[in-house]
Amino acid sequence: MLPDKKAFKESLKALKKHVTQDKVCDIRQHFSEDEQRFARLSIRLDDLLFDFSKCGVTLDTLQLLDNLAIAADVLGKREAMFSGKIINTTEKRSVLHIALRLAADKVFILNDRDIVQDIQSVLARMVKFSKMIRDGSYKGYSGERITDIVNIGIGGSDLGPAMVTSALKPYHDGPHCHFVSSVDSAHITDILADLNPATTLFIIASKTFTTTETIENARVARQWIHSHLGENAVGVHFVAVSSAIDKAIEFGIDSSRIFEFWDWVGGRYSIWSAIGLVVMLAIGDQNFRQFLEGARQMDQHFKDTPLHQNIPIRFALLGFWHRVICGYSSRAIVPYEQRLVRFPAYLQQLDMESNGKHVSLEGRPITFSTGPVVWGDSGSNGQHAFFQFLHQGTDIVPVEFILFVKGHEPNLNHMHDILVANCLAQSEALMKGRSHEDVYHTLMNDGGESDEADNLAFHKSLQGNRPSIMLIQDLLTPFTLGRLMALYEHRIFVEGILMNINSFDQWGVELGKEFANELLPVIRGENEADNRDGSTLGLLKHIQNRYVE
């Protein structure tokens, strides 16, 4: 079935009318009227609980959203992705990061080739190499064991691997892993300052092997090895993860240490491919397979579960409701798990690079707001930073809480109890708020003066009725992390379907790159600053004058 544009417009119109009705978004009233609201508005998948009962929706809202999903042909486009059809239309590519998670005994034919065999072949090479590094049988040029890995990449070659490696710290039993992404020389300088060239291995992670930031950092690392160990050491201390095998070889990396991935794997979805080599080195191949298995479970759930019980689809519909219908311009990601402190930054790329688009699949301007601003921090830090804004700011920001029932430190369970209590409390406080009247009576009971109490009560009252979603799993493990990440991948894909955009390209990042290439020789004094705007000319002049001084 193709999208039904007429039915979609009617569904959108019905939703916009529905949101204006009295009490539709009154979460507190919904709970007072329905004792079964939590049961009706939550979904479970094994130990994963997806609770959206604190969103301003009713059963009627959900039905209208389901109608919208049907009109947009969410199920048909889901099938198109899983069958390998070209859904990245502007780049004419299939979108098959899901294939990277398939079991080894599956078959997936793309262009007359079983890509599962290709995937498993690269995975087997990753396993063999990681075991050699981890057991010490792979030696550096001087015969010493490799103790430190430096992953050089940016965007999807950095955000995912760095986040996952940090999140799975309790499972680390391999070499120390470091990440360099910025072209700011301070980044690689500070990392290398604490490392020994003889025991350091570099992973150059770049799909095209042309990304400026990555290649500049790789050259610095190459020179560092060359100056300390000699040119012959370069091939021993570097591996590459890339689609551009020839460019990696030209850089000086032996073909046996180049791990391939394919053009049907988008950068921000590449953690499941050889880009995840650094993760495997840190946690071992069995834990890495569990990571893939967790994502596979969510893939299966997304593929096979009916619409009304499908967590990624329901998650996406709520995101559409908040962004397009309610007009909330951002969403806050708040993991109450310190090891997921980098998860919001990872989701920023996954979400905003995917759905930060202004034209439809047909190349026409979109008439409603698309992807929201995605931001956040770990829960404990957030409470002492931006939660004031969430509770009393003039903008309503839906919050997505991520919580785990248990921690990895059983001797410190009392601290985890405090963490859980704070997460649940913030979710409840955002919804319930505190009225001026309640605050006033409390102040008066504490012996306050009437006029002063009345004024102070305005400052201390909270409107409440602020929506939030809660995602709870038992424990942060490779499996549960993989499942969580796949959930967000599919949610963002479905939101893109509802917005009628291509979630798998990123043309918006190209113009800045072009301008940077034009400006670099100007900054170096090699070219004149022709055809620049007045502001840029002024900035260039200031920088050049200050540099001379």
Curated annotation (Swiss-Prot):
It catalyses: alpha-D-glucose 6-phosphate = beta-D-fructose 6-phosphate. Keywords: Cytoplasm, Gluconeogenesis, Glycolysis, Isomerase. This is Glucose-6-phosphate isomerase. It comes from the Bacteria. Transmembrane segments: none annotated. The keyword Secreted does not apply. Pathway: Carbohydrate biosynthesis; gluconeogenesis; Carbohydrate degradation; glycolysis; D-glyceraldehyde 3-phosphate and glycerone phosphate from D-glucose: step 2/4. It is found in: Cytoplasm. PANTHER family: GLUCOSE-6-PHOSPHATE ISOMERASE (PTHR11469:SF1). One of its GO terms (molecular function) is carbohydrate derivative binding. GO terms for biological process: gluconeogenesis; glucose 6-phosphate metabolic process; glycolytic process. The keyword Isomerase applies. Pfam families: PGI.
